[in-house]
Amino acid sequence: MTKKKSHKPGSATIALNKRARHEYFIEDEIEAGLSLQGWEVKSLRAGKANISDSYVIMRDGEAYLFGATITPLNVASTHVVCDPTRTRKLLLKQRELANLYGQINRDGYTVVALSLYWKNAWCKIKIGVAKGKKDHDKRDTIKDREWKLDKARIMKNANR
């Protein structure tokens, strides 16, 4: 029998959007595939992606990732035009597209990119249906996080 291939060392995560969880309430998460060109796959394998300002737009019954930057490698071909910020099509089932379209038609909701990662040999993106936070909500989140740290520090010192 043949041995199973062990996966490559390192993380499968290519890029994270940490700002999304700070600026939005994430209500639903969906995994989607990406339609990529060859040079984009090579750049993603090198980890040259940024999804911090990216979001999803719906056009003609399809979902597209807008604002994601994939920086081309220096060794990319000269006869291929590399557009780092091109709009990329998301690969979703019709049922998922209809569900997503219904959720974002509500007032104040949008779809943001949360993370970009490898699943087996395929590049996947996790998108989230999100509602924007107000300033006081952001302050409450920071206050809760700091209180957790203080509480852990107090408990650590109390157990000595």
Swiss-Prot record:
Alphabetized InterPro entries for the sequence: SmpB, SsrA-bd_prot, SsrA-bd_prot_CS
Protein's gene: smpB
Keyword set, alphabetical order: Cytoplasm, RNA-binding
HAMAP family, per the entry: SmpB
One of the GO biological process terms: trans-translation
Family per record: Belongs to the SmpB family.
GO molecular function: RNA binding
SUPFAM superfamilies for the chain: Small protein B (SmpB)
The protein, known as: SsrA-binding protein
NCBIfam families recorded: PRK05422.1, smpB
Function: Required for rescue of stalled ribosomes mediated by trans-translation. Binds to transfer-messenger RNA (tmRNA), required for stable association of tmRNA with ribosomes. tmRNA and SmpB together mimic tRNA shape, replacing the anticodon stem-loop with SmpB. tmRNA is encoded by the ssrA gene; the 2 termini fold to resemble tRNA(Ala) and it encodes a 'tag peptide', a short internal open reading frame. During trans-translation Ala-aminoacylated tmRNA acts like a tRNA, entering the A-site of stalled ribosomes, displacing the stalled mRNA.
Species this chain originates from: Proteus mirabilis (strain HI4320)
Any one GO CC term of the record: cytosol
Subcellular location, record wording: Cytoplasm
UniProt superkingdom: Bacteria
